């Protein structure tokens, strides 16, 4: 084959090479080839609120403090060529001092659990402290972000997981919440 015939043949094949190069962009190296969604997040209804009383009576005069999960903020992004989902989650907790409060600092324990199907993959026990200045009885606190990299693939996507958030309650507080939840 002479040089001119080779160049003519090469020119005829250029569209084929161009098409193959476009297809190669759809492989695992293309960040747009696999764009996972963020993990669904939920607040456990039974663990969304916490009341602490000074004494056995559960009336307003003995309320030391009350806390509740007011919201969850977060972001997610592809953390590794479609193999991990980089997730950040922060919790917003509202805290109110009650008439029986004797301290200005209250530590609120909470958790963020990563659930896959019906299994708890990991549970992060965390806490945040409310510092009440004089003449302030209500605060909204935002936690530092919890950072997690979740393994994902085309078969095991972000919908396979969910984050569950709640306040870490004593058995008595949990029973109280269950008893007083709307049905």
Positions of the model-derived regions?
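Bacterial N-terminal signal peptides that target proteins for export
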Residues: 2-15
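C-terminal motif of bacterial Sec signal peptides marking the signal peptidase cleavage site
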Residues: 21-25
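Bacterial signal peptide processing site
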Residues: 27-30
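Post-signal peptide N-terminal segment of mature Sec-exported envelope proteins
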Residues: 34-57
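Helix-rich interaction surfaces within compact, conserved domain-sized segments
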Residues: 35-36, 122-183
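Short, solvent-exposed beta-strand/turn "edge" segments of beta-rich domains on protein surfaces
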Residues: 59-65, 73-87, 97-104, 154-156
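Beta-strand elements of well-folded, non-transmembrane domains
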Residues: 71-76, 89-99, 110-118, 130-134, ...
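A short, structured loop/turn motif at beta-sheet edges
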Residues: 81-84, 114-121, 155-159
């Amino acid at each position: 084959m002479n040089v001119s015939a080779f160049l003519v043949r090469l020119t005829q094949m250029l569209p084929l090479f161009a098409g193959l190069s476009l297809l190669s962009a759809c492989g695992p190296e293309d960040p747009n080839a696999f764009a996972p969604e963020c993990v669904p997040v939920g607040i456990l209804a039974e663990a969304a609120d916490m009341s602490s009383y000074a004494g056995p009576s559960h009336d307003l005069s003995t309320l030391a403090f009350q806390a509740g999960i007011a919201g969850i903020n977060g972001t997610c992004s592809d953390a590794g060529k479609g193999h991990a989902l980089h997730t950040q989650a922060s919790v917003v907790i509202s805290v109110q001092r009650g008439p029986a409060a004797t301290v200005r600092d209250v530590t609120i324990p909470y958790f963020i659990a990563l659930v896959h199907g019906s299994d708890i993959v990991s549970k992060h026990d965390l806490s945040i402290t409310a510092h009440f200045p004089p003449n302030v009885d209500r605060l909204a606190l935002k936690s530092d972000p919890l950072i997690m990299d979740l393994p994902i693939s085309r078969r095991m996507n972000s919908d396979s997981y969910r984050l569950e958030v709640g306040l870490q309650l004593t058995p008595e507080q949990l029973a109280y919440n269950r008893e007083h939840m709307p049905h």
